[in-house]
């Protein structure tokens, strides 16, 4: 049974950005975050948590969000930064970068989850925000489509790992490929399965 959450009550603010991340769990590639300010006069139908949408639907909404949003941006932390900072801190930094990169600065930021990075404006964490807040849903779609496409590019370079299929997550196929072929530069050296393969303990 999934727990039902109360409908989200928006804070009194003029320009609200939603922020979400994709890629905290994978063993390879960047953690990608997005920030989106939606236009209330140009609504987008069908926004929800990106994980609940088909790839085809995500791609359609990805283009629609970019076209209709007041502003959208991406922020990221690469594997080297993740290894240096740890994944939670790297995610916070990536979120800060996404917000800072918006062409229009929001006066309030809603962030998926339960942790908030330090930001120059008011912010609020929203549990299950990708389901409850349209701005966060939009950010989750932008971040996921962006990262998935990066994994497809990496897959073309290193087809032996199956990145296009598992998107870098630690599936049995991925871990077996790591054991067989070793790690590539884009693998996160601080993540346990990669550390084990590299003999770093």
UniProtKB/Swiss-Prot annotation:
Gene3D superfamilies attached to this UniProt entry: Ribonuclease H-like superfamily/Ribonuclease H
PROSITE patterns in alphabetical order: RNASE_H_2
Family: Belongs to the RNase HII family.
Superkingdom, natural source: Bacteria
Location within or outside the cell: Cytoplasm
Gene Ontology CC terms: cytoplasm; ribonuclease H2 complex
Cofactors named for this entry: Mn(2+); Mg(2+)
Binding site for a divalent metal cation: 20-21, 112
Reported function: Endonuclease that specifically degrades the RNA of RNA-DNA hybrids.
Keywords: Cytoplasm, Endonuclease, Hydrolase, Manganese, Metal-binding, Nuclease
Protein's UniProt name: Ribonuclease HII
GO BP terms, alphabetized: DNA replication, removal of RNA primer; mismatch repair
RNase H type-2 domain mapped to chain residues: 14-201
Enzyme nomenclature, EC number: 3.1.26.4
CDD domains linked: RNase_HII_bacteria_HII_like
Organism, as annotated: Photobacterium profundum (strain SS9)
